[in-house]
Swiss-Prot record:
Pfam families: BLI1 (PF17324). This is Biogenesis of lysosome-related organelles complex 1 subunit BLI1. Belongs to the BLI1 family. It is found in: Endosome. Component of the biogenesis of lysosome-related organelles complex-1 (BLOC-1) involved in endosomal cargo sorting. It comes from Vanderwaltozyma polyspora (strain ATCC 22028 / DSM 70294 / BCRC 21397 / CBS 2163 / NBRC 10782 / NRRL Y-8283 / UCD 57-17).
Length: 116
């Protein structure tokens, strides 16, 4: 029985050792890939930093406020457009009603003059 326990213990230790080797190898690969990407990104950042300048936070805030103002003005303009579209619809309807009333009045007058 003692011999079986020793063999089992040795087998478990061997499995643990192989598992640890695998984990260490994969960790080293992942660290190497990560380090390579960090270095690559650092070089790319240095390259584009020369091409593009970053805006100051105050300037970015000014742009944000300007954008908000323009959005508000657009909203107001859209409201005015909707108002004038409704007004146009009402004026078109009013014009149609006036035209109908004018025709009715014309017919009434012509009947009146024909009867006289």
């Amino acid at each position: 029985m003692r011999e079986q326990e020793r063999k089992l213990s040795n087998g478990i230790e061997h499995c643990l050792s192989k598992t640890q080797e695998y984990v260490d190898m994969e960790s080293a690969k992942a660290i190497s890939i990560f380090s390579s990407k960090v270095n690559s990104n650092g070089r790319w950042l240095a390259e584009i930093s020369g091409k593009y300048e970053l805006k100051e936070s105050g300037e970015l805030e000014a742009f944000r406020l300007l954008k908000e103002d323009h959005v508000k003005m657009l909203d107001q303009l859209e409201g005015k457009i909707e108002y004038y579209e409704k007004l146009l619809d009402e004026l078109t309807e009013f014009t149609s009603e006036i035209e109908i009333k004018r025709k009715i009045e014309k017919n009434r007058r012509s009947r009146h003059f024909n009867n006289v």
